[in-house]
């Protein structure tokens, strides 16, 4: 219901406005006060000895940050860097922090997005709610550039480049602060970032257009790859920030979807509930982020659809040129 108020101008907003408006004002006041405390030095803000790139957003929910992080990490690896990725591990609880993600890490300990980033890139990934501690650990392990998955509002960590990802279709909704609207910070915050990446929809002036390009469906058990439109009677589910985006992609690919089920972002799946859902079709299709949580109890007819961020060559060059400039300021070199 809350997203209908934020993005769809639902009539119930008139009933909830008197309650949510003062809470939104309070949220804004607290956020401004905390940010100001870091800016004037009243609160400590960690400056790393290597470049830090923050990939975040100014709205609550998923906008496509993780594909951007993966794209950045892969490009940096191609250029000879040893990138380290920082995440707070949303929804997870590690036995110890900072936690360095590896092939044996449970998503309940590290989070689904950190595990996905590790599996896709093989990069160093560290999880800690206190992000500077994760950065320090990654530097100890040999990272020479940091990419943070989310953390735009985590001012305890200084950064050199800020990248904001925007949902190109939903944009900023009613443009109100949480909880009245989806904003973590006012839209004026965008004036101070290095890049605004628009995921789908129409990029506004000065923004970088990104599309998420789907690959072939991958079997969770065997790794076999097939075109998604060759799979019959699909049960599709997604536990991401905006599940309809995934279902729309399947529709555009001509997939034979008989059931679609959305779940909350970062939700832990009950194996029995997912198995019951799966019985409604011949095959199951899910997002790659969901696959890292489902692999331990997957069946032979379960598939996931990987997607990759894609930019124009001009925009790629813009982003990489800015990174090169920052690296030179540090006097760093590739690995």
UniProtKB/Swiss-Prot annotation:
GO biological process: lipid A biosynthetic process; lipopolysaccharide core region biosynthetic process
Pfam families xref list: LpxK (PF02606)
Alphabetical UniProt keywords: ATP-binding, Kinase, Lipid A biosynthesis, Lipid biosynthesis, Lipid metabolism, Nucleotide-binding, Transferase
Cellular component GO terms, alphabetical: plasma membrane
Source superkingdom: Bacteria
SUPFAM superfamilies registered for this protein in UniProt: P-loop containing nucleoside triphosphate hydrolases
Gene Ontology molecular function: ATP binding; tetraacyldisaccharide 4'-kinase activity
Catalytic reactions on record: a lipid A disaccharide + ATP = a lipid IVA + ADP + H(+)
Xref: InterPro entries: LpxK, P-loop_NTPase
Record pathway: Glycolipid biosynthesis; lipid IV(A) biosynthesis; lipid IV(A) from (3R)-3-hydroxytetradecanoyl-[acyl-carrier-protein] and UDP-N-acetyl-alpha-D-glucosamine: step 6/6
Binding site residues for ATP: 59-66
Enzyme Commission code: 2.7.1.130
Function statement: Transfers the gamma-phosphate of ATP to the 4'-position of a tetraacyldisaccharide 1-phosphate intermediate (termed DS-1-P) to form tetraacyldisaccharide 1,4'-bis-phosphate (lipid IVA).
NCBIfam families tied to this protein: lpxK
UniProt xrefs under PANTHER family: TETRAACYLDISACCHARIDE 4'-KINASE (PTHR42724), TETRAACYLDISACCHARIDE 4'-KINASE, MITOCHONDRIAL-RELATED (PTHR42724:SF1)
Record-stated family: Belongs to the LpxK family.
Name of the protein: Tetraacyldisaccharide 4'-kinase
The organism of origin for this protein: Vibrio vulnificus (strain YJ016)
